[in-house]
Amino acid sequence: MLWEPELAPTEALFQEAVEHVARKLGRAKEYPTAPLPDDRAAAVLALDTWAGSDVDWRGELRRYYEEHIPVRVRPGAAVNATLRRLHTSGVRLVWASPGPAEATEVLLHHLGVARLIDEVVIATSASGAASSLGLTDAVLVENGLDELLALAGEAAVPT
């Protein structure tokens, strides 16, 4: 179980994208003045509630990600190589993300790992994602590259 915020931090990009959505779509439907919750899953729910069927905030967020992700997130060679080795050896790779799914899909394609990931789960934590799938023996990679490399039996090489 791979936890997105540690392997590919996108919190700043998400915040920028939400600000863009508010500016652009707020002209079509008044955007609430109350700040969004800090928890991303709760923020996504609040955005869904605000948008209803009046505006497509998810589509606009996806477009923002597609345009801006190359500047904000760089693919990591060590992460990609390790995920390829794990995938080739038959390890089931589950990517857990705070969402939304549209942003996660763009991220995985940008990182070049979309085909290596067996399943994507939107959840508030890696352990929550594992529980939702009924994975009691899942190895959780929640603390970044070193933990991923340890899972693959490798050591980090300083660059």
What are these regions (language model features)?
Residues 66-95, 101-105:
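Short, acidic loop-to-helix structural element flanking the phosphoryl-transfer center
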Residues 23, 87, 153-156:
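Anion (oxyanion) recognition and catalysis
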Residues 13, 74-78, 99-100, 125, ...:
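Short beta->alpha linker loops
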Residues 21, 46-47, 85, 107, ...:
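Residues within well-ordered alpha helices
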Residues 1-77:
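N-terminal helical cap/lid subdomain that shapes the substrate entry/recognition surface
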Residues 10, 95-96:
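Small/polar loops that bind or transfer phosphate-bearing groups
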Residues 53-55, 80-85, 145-148:
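Short glycine/proline-centered loop/turn elements that form peptide/ligand docking sites
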Residues 101, 105-159:
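Asp-based, Mg2+/Mn2+-dependent phosphohydrolase catalytic module
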